Amino acid sequence: MSVPTVLERIIARKFQEVAERSARVSLAELEALAKAADAPRGFANALIEQAKRKQPAVIAEIKKASPSKGVIREHFVPAEIAVSYEKGGATCLSVLTDVDYFQGADVYLQQARAAVSLPVIRKDFMVDPYQIVEARALGADCVLLIVSALDDVKMAELAATAKDVGLDVLVEVHDGDELERALKTLDTPLVGVNNRNLHTFEVSLETTLDLLPRIPRDRLAITESGILNRADVELMAINEVYSFLVGEAFMRAEQPGLELQRLFFPEQVKKTVQPLD
């Protein structure tokens, strides 16, 4: 019998988690909370408008740890990081809420969103409509659907639930087959290409460049994972990719928002950093 991949272990845990959570808070209770939540801030629209101007549309991620790297950031205050990102020029935020593998928490999303005016995506592994309604109840503006974790019927069901509760959807793909499935099944404008293989956790920016010609112009290509330096950003810009999801490069920096500026808006760093006398 083959050993389950990291993604397979995470997904198995998610089904258990949904059962545990729905036993504590019913779907009807969650739906009431979702209706009472603050209005969505327009995650997709914010990215699309920024990218139209050929300016970096950065989804800045708030992530304490990962299965492949362990703890990434020791000093972890989500509200503080969110404010730093907003000052640094982020267009949107991504907050990890997975507890077991990423040391995330629902409250991190709430704390981050309350501290800023930016739209926020709940970064988690969605396998059930319950989690989608839960995301809206937490105040999220968008949810992530990972094609490699879902069949087409489930993907469509989750996207329909997201639409019902007013959430945008970012669909994430890693190869051509997944891209084809995503484009066929969903009408979301946000197509994320994860340069990290979620089964092996290996990273290659070539993944985005290979899939880019197959992403229609009426969709927004978002490159995810592996953007670590200015050369990576410039490589994407040459290929007309202006939307990014970046986490680790920022999380390892003492000042995440300043690192965001260095990577994406270096001319602003020159203006804000005064030379020593």
Swiss-Prot record:
Pfam families to which the protein is assigned, alphabetical: IGPS
InterPro entries in UniProt: Aldolase_TIM, Indole-3-glycerol_P_synth, Indole-3-glycerol_P_synth_dom, Indole-3-GlycerolPSynthase_CS, RibuloseP-bd_barrel
Enzyme Commission number, as recorded: 4.1.1.48
SUPFAM superfamilies in UniProt: Ribulose-phoshate binding barrel
Keyword line: Amino-acid biosynthesis, Aromatic amino acid biosynthesis, Decarboxylase, Lyase, Tryptophan biosynthesis
Pathway where this protein functions: Amino-acid biosynthesis; L-tryptophan biosynthesis; L-tryptophan from chorismate: step 4/5
GO biological process: one example: L-tryptophan biosynthetic process
GO molecular function (one): indole-3-glycerol-phosphate synthase activity
Class of enzymatic activity (EC top level): lyase
Catalytic activity, reaction form: 1-(2-carboxyphenylamino)-1-deoxy-D-ribulose 5-phosphate + H(+) = (1S,2R)-1-C-(indol-3-yl)glycerol 3-phosphate + CO2 + H2O
Family membership noted in the UniProt record: Belongs to the TrpC family.
Name recorded for this polypeptide: Indole-3-glycerol phosphate synthase
Lineage: Bacteria, Pseudomonadati, Pseudomonadota, Gammaproteobacteria, Pseudomonadales
